[in-house]
């Protein structure tokens, strides 16, 4: 029996490649973890970039998020009870109207089989103005498309990569989140995120999980 997701939600994730906002953290938890992040930034300003990959190894409080029962229940409904944390990666956008992610597939860099499920966990409200994720429904079934590296320093992606094959962007869905909500997607889905045009930071933690039989 599913823990928290309905049969319709589970079917939607596997057929469309994503799920929209699911509440997993209380307001108190959000404030606590946001405080932990801000404390780290103050104490180790030169190490903030290390939070962009496998931050659960560096910070015990990030590992606590990875073990959160509400979050794990969601993943269990999608990939079963035997779960391995692949990575916890912060994707922070300052309100400078510069940082973005072009259209890409995470599966191009991490071709994990049978599945890598990525959750965008919001530690602050994340609307389109903040630069929320945009996904192309069902595109995880297309296979990995051709990507081109640009090295653009304004890209939130490691190589400034983007999909150089044509696809229909008009089908994009915005994954807007309230603080404490998580939106999930298959690593193979085509997705992007625009610049942050708000006056607040976008604070998103990517929660990347795989089944242990991967």
Map each language-model feature to its residues:
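Short, conserved beta-strand element in jelly-roll/cupin
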Residues: 111-128, 176-179, 184, 207-211
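Non-heme Fe(II)-dependent double-stranded beta-helix
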Residues: 1-112, 147-148
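Short, solvent-exposed loop/turn segments at secondary-structure junctions
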Residues: 26-27, 91-93, 108, 126-128, ...
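Non-heme Fe(II)/2-oxoglutarate
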Residues: 39-43, 74, 182-184, 188-214
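Active-site region of the double-stranded beta-helix
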Residues: 81, 105-112, 121-132, 138-140, ...
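Double-stranded beta-helix
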Residues: 128-194
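Residues that flank catalytic or metal-binding motifs in active/ligand-binding sites
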Residues: 58, 86, 115-117, 129-131, ...
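A short beta-loop-beta micro-motif enriched in histidine and acidic residues
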Residues: 104-116, 170-171, 177-178, 200-201
């Amino acid at each position: 029996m599913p823990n928290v997701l309905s049969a319709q939600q589970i079917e939607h994730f596997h057929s469309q490649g994503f799920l929209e906002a699911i509440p997993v953290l209380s307001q108190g938890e959000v404030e606590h973890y946001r405080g932990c992040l801000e404390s780290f930034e103050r104490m180790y300003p030169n190490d903030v970039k290390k939070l962009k990959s496998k931050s659960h190894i560096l910070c015990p409080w990030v590992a606590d998020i990875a073990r959160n029962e509400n979050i794990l229940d969601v993943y269990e409904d999608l990939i079963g009870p035997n779960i391995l944390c692949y990575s916890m990666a912060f994707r922070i956008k300052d309100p400078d109207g510069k940082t973005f992610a072009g259209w890409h597939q995470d599966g191009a860099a991490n071709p994990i089989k049978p599945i890598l499920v990525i959750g965008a966990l919001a530690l602050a409200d994340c609307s389109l103005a903040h630069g929320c994720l945009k996904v192309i429904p069902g595109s995880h079934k297309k296979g990995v498309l051709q990507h081109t590296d640009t090295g653009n320093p304004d890209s939130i992606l490691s190589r400034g990569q983007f999909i150089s094959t044509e696809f229909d962007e008009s089908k994009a869905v915005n994954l807007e989140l309230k603080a404490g909500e998580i939106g999930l997607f298959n690593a193979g889905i085509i997705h992007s995120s625009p610049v942050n045009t708000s006056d607040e930071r976008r604070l998103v933690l990517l929660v990347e999980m795989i089944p242990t039989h991967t």
